Regions:
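Short amphipathic alpha-helices and their capping/turn segments at secondary-structure boundaries
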Residues: 2-19, 101-104
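Short glycine-rich anion-binding loops that position phosphate/pyrophosphate groups of nucleotides
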Residues: 24-26, 91-94, 117-119
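Glycine- and acidic-residue-enriched helix-capping/strand-helix junction motifs
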Residues: 29-44
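Short beta->alpha junction loops
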Residues: 60-70
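Short, glycine-/small-residue-rich phosphate/pyrophosphate-handling segment
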Residues: 63, 121-175
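Short Gly/Thr/Asp-enriched flexible loops that form oxyanion-binding sites at enzyme active sites
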Residues: 78, 96-107
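Short acidic/histidine-rich motifs immediately flanking catalytic phosphotransfer sites
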Residues: 79-86
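Short, acidic/small-residue loops that bind anionic groups at enzyme active sites
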Residues: 104-124
């Protein structure tokens, strides 16, 4: 999977480190509905796509994936002191991942929630899941959300988070300290 070359004008040349976390069932990419998940053949292919896109943005991407909530919690605890923000696809933890959400919230770092599908779409919608909308336990504390755009949701989240990290006034710094 190749990414397209593009130019984004950033207000900083700082090389942010952004952690991308993929939760349970993301290891099954390539075996799931093409309508929802597109042509990504594997989780490794997705990771490479996001990492390459990060290089174009001038940021470092660190990928982590697990089918186990405890492993994800340990990763968040271990990485919080060295990363600048998180992108998470909670996947199988979307409705039950309170522990992961709390751990992310405790880091006080920006968090982008991503989904291949539009989890808020009604049943049968073009980018929705077959069963209709679901309520994410992450959405109400996420800094931002990108969903319904397959792997492009990750690229949009990476772009938005990078630009937000560059803009000190956006993520809470007093406006006079830019």
């Amino acid at each position: 999977m190749s990414t397209h070359n593009f130019t984004v004008t950033r207000s900083s040349n700082r090389k942010h480190l952004i952690a991308v976390i993929d939760g349970p069932n993301m290891s099954s990419l390539g075996k799931r509905s093409k309508k929802v998940y597109g042509n990504i053949q594997s989780l490794d292919e997705l990771k490479e796509c996001v990492r390459n896109f990060g290089e174009q943005l001038g940021v470092e991407v660190e990928n982590f994936s697990s089918n186990h909530m405890g492993d994800i919690l340990e990763y968040i605890h271990e990485s919080a002191h060295r990363v600048d923000g998180y992108i998470i696809n909670p996947a199988g933890l979307t409705t039950i991942g309170e522990g992961v959400r709390h751990a992310l919230e405790d880091t006080e770092l920006p968090v982008m929630e991503v989904h291949f599908s539009n989890i808020a779409a009604s049943a049968g919608a073009a980018r929705g899941l077959g069963g209709g909308s679901i309520q994410s336990s992450f959405t109400h504390t996420a800094t931002g959300i990108c969903m319904g755009m397959r792997h492009y949701s990750y690229l949009a989240a990476l772009t938005a988070l990078t630009l937000a990290l560059d803009d000190q006034s956006f993520l809470g710094a007093p406006s006079g300290q830019q």
